[in-house]
């Protein structure tokens, strides 16, 4: 019985790869030196009928169990044999179909996930997804022509990439602020158009507007407000300190008057005893 099981395993090693229901398994290795294989679980990305999706239907491959050393460039290269890859995006967890997709910033983004991830691979043609589902391995992530950095070399590269280019950073910030200002202007224009106009039920929305315009929430305005609050707080603390000092000085003055009064009393008693006291 044991010999029969060994014979079946030796004859059919790849066809018995356990994988989640509906997924195909693709074995990969970090390099040629690695003996054990790691498995990527892939399926065609799809959503329910009538639900909007961020990714194009029939051209997107959803990948599970992506190891940390497998980058977007590595996945694009590994799957390029199946067809032209349009884009690859790694994420911590799968996207909700209903959630709107926000453009990712090149500089202002959270730290990379230190663990296994999921990936969305978009091919230019649907045939790329079909070829990826039938792909056999093992595929090599790091090769001589396309080495993947690891260890201290990866740390050095990550540190160098963490220092942003000032000009590129300025361009991205300016672009974001222009889009934000345009959005605020559109919202204000829409609110102004709807002001005083009754809705379907006859209600009129009343918006309170101050006589003075609100300060723009810029960094300079925020710094001025903070400086004004600091001066007000320090002035209040200074006034409290002077009042406390005034009470202290008044108490010391009264103590000195009492001391001088006692000294004058003793001197008068001494002069009376010596019969030299002449008050006039």
Curated annotation (Swiss-Prot):
Positions of post-translational Phosphoserine modification: 99
UniProt xrefs under InterPro entries: Nucleotide-bd_a/b_plait_sf (IPR012677), RBD_domain_sf (IPR035979), RRM_Rrp7 (IPR040447), RRP7 (IPR040446), RRP7_C (IPR024326), Rrp7A_RRM (IPR034890)
Keywords: Cell projection, Cytoplasm, Cytoskeleton, Disease variant, Intellectual disability, Nucleus, Phosphoprotein, Primary microcephaly, RNA-binding
Disease implication from the record: Microcephaly 28, primary, autosomal recessive: A form of microcephaly, a disease defined as a head circumference more than 3 standard deviations below the age, sex and ethnically matched mean. Brain weight is markedly reduced and the cerebral cortex is disproportionately small. MCPH28 is an autosomal recessive form characterized by reduced head size (down to -8 SD) and variably impaired intellectual development apparent from early childhood.
Subunit comment: Part of the small subunit (SSU) processome, composed of more than 70 proteins and the RNA chaperone small nucleolar RNA (snoRNA) U3. Interacts with NOL6; required for NOL6 localization to nucleolus.
Function according to Swiss-Prot or TrEMBL: Nucleolar protein that is involved in ribosomal RNA (rRNA) processing. Also plays a role in primary cilia resorption, and cell cycle progression in neurogenesis and neocortex development. Part of the small subunit (SSU) processome, first precursor of the small eukaryotic ribosomal subunit.
Similarity comment: Belongs to the RRP7 family.
Organism: Homo sapiens (Human)
Higher taxonomy: Eukaryota, Metazoa, Chordata, Craniata, Vertebrata
GO cellular component terms, A-Z: cell junction; centrosome; cilium; CURI complex; cytoplasm; nucleolus; nucleoplasm; small-subunit processome
Cell compartment(s), UniProt: Nucleus, Nucleolus; Cell projection, Cilium; Cytoplasm, Cytoskeleton, Microtubule organizing center, Centrosome
One family name in Pfam for this protein: RRP7
Gene Ontology biological process terms, A to Z: blastocyst formation; cilium disassembly; protein localization to nucleolus; ribosomal small subunit assembly; ribosomal small subunit biogenesis; ribosome biogenesis; rRNA processing
A GO MF term: RNA binding
Tissue expression: Expressed in the apical radial glial cells in the developing brain.
Name of the protein in its database record: Ribosomal RNA-processing protein 7 homolog A
